[in-house]
């Protein structure tokens, strides 16, 4: 679930506000873009989101320098992290109204998986907030999103520096496993507290004759990483080779 969003996914068409990773084809074929008004809005949106994740990055660095330790740095960036990650819900709307040519279903899945991890796990189970695993996925997300939103901004302006394109299609090699590891370890750390408190679980009997075990649900989410992670990771590796090699060939003909 959250694994798909760790590096902003491997499928989709990007387009400045939708979510796509090493699999978007913006480097290999041109598509009709949004109108002038929509483009202006998307540029502003992506600039704001880039700035937001830069604020998170600076907050992490400042907190580390002040404390001299990487433990419990989450508390120093908790509010901006929640705000800007939740703000990504707008990307679902971008796809729904057609200003970004990405799948509404895929984008919803990717965005909601991150929002779920932030609010339904990290926020709800406060005992895990001091875990190093939280910092692991926060750092991975932060670097990924700074690059991703910068990529979309420059793409919309038709002036994409090769360094940003290279970073987008290369750094996921480290950031994706790093983010996934942090997510899994955080969910795992939350399990005993969820079970003890019966968090978000619904027991029978009740008037709706319905039960839900949040503890088991989290375990299923962790299991879902097993088929999803390798498939997306190697797909992204393949797309990286295709897109960056196409860029190199294009440079030779210039």
Swiss-Prot record:
Q: How does it assemble?
A: May interact with enzymes of the ELO family (including ELOVL1); with those enzymes that mediate condensation, the first of the four steps of the reaction cycle responsible for fatty acids elongation, may be part of a larger fatty acids elongase complex. Interacts with BCAP31. Interacts (via the third lumenal loop) with TECR.
Annotated localization: Endoplasmic reticulum membrane
Start and end residues of each stretch annotated as Disordered: 11-33
Q: Biological process GO terms, please? A: fatty acid elongation; long-chain fatty-acyl-CoA biosynthetic process; sphingolipid biosynthetic process; very long-chain fatty acid biosynthetic process
The name of this protein is: Very-long-chain (3R)-3-hydroxyacyl-CoA dehydratase 2
- Top enzyme class: lyase
**Naturally occurring in which organism (per UniProt):** Homo sapiens
Please list where the region (May be involved in interaction with TECR) is annotated.
Answer: 198-214
Q: What is the lineage of its organism?
A: Eukaryota, Metazoa, Chordata, Craniata, Vertebrata
Sites carrying sugar chains = 209
List the biased-composition ranges (Gly residues). 12-21
Q: Where are the transmembrane segments?
A: 42-60, 80-97, 108-125, 131-146, 170-187, 218-235
The GO terms describing molecular function are: 3-hydroxyacyl-CoA dehydratase activity; enzyme binding; very-long-chain (3R)-3-hydroxyacyl-CoA dehydratase activity
Modification N-acetylalanine occurs at: 2
Keywords in UniProt for this one?
Acetylation, Endoplasmic reticulum, Fatty acid biosynthesis, Fatty acid metabolism, Glycoprotein, Lipid biosynthesis, Lipid metabolism, Lyase, Membrane, Transmembrane, Transmembrane helix
Function according to Swiss-Prot or TrEMBL: Catalyzes the third of the very long-chain fatty acids (VLCFA) elongation four-step cycle (condensation, reduction, dehydration, and reduction). This endoplasmic reticulum-elongation process is characterized by the addition of two carbons to the lipid chain through each cycle. This enzyme catalyzes the dehydration of the 3-hydroxyacyl-CoA intermediate into trans-2,3-enoyl-CoA, within each cycle of elongation. Therefore, it participates in the production of various VLCFAs involved in multiple biological processes as precursors of membrane lipids and lipid mediators.
Pathway field: Lipid metabolism; fatty acid biosynthesis
């Amino acid at each position: 679930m959250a694994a798909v969003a760790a590096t902003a996914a491997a499928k989709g068409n990007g387009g400045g506000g939708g979510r796509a990773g090493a699999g978007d084809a913006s480097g290999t074929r041109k598509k009709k873009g949004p109108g002038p008004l929509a483009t202006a809005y998307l540029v502003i949106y992506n600039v704001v989101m880039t700035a937001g994740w830069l604020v998170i990055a600076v907050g992490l660095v400042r907190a580390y320098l002040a404390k001299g330790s990487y433990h419990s740095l989450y508390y120093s960036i908790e509010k901006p992290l929640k705000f800007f990650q939740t703000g990504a819900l707008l990307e679902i709307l971008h796809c729904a109204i057609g200003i970004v040519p990405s799948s509404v279903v895929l984008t919803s899945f990717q965005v909601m998986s991150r929002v779920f991890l932030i609010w339904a796990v990290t926020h709800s189970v406060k005992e895990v907030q001091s875990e190093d695993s939280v910092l692991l996925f926060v750092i991975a997300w932060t670097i990924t999103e700074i690059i991703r939103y910068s990529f979309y901004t420059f793409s919309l302006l038709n002036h994409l520096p090769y360094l940003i394109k290279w970073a987008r299609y290369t750094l996921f090699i480290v950031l994706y496993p790093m983010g996934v590891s942090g997510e899994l370890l955080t969910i795992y750390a939350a399990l005993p507290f969820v079970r003890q408190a019966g968090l978000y679980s619904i027991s029978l009997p009740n008037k709706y004759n319905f039960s839900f075990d949040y503890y088991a649900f989290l375990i299923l989410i962790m299991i879902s990483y097993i088929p999803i992670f390798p498939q997306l990771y190697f797909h992204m590796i393949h797309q990286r080779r295709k897109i960056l090699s196409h860029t190199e060939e294009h440079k030779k003909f210039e």
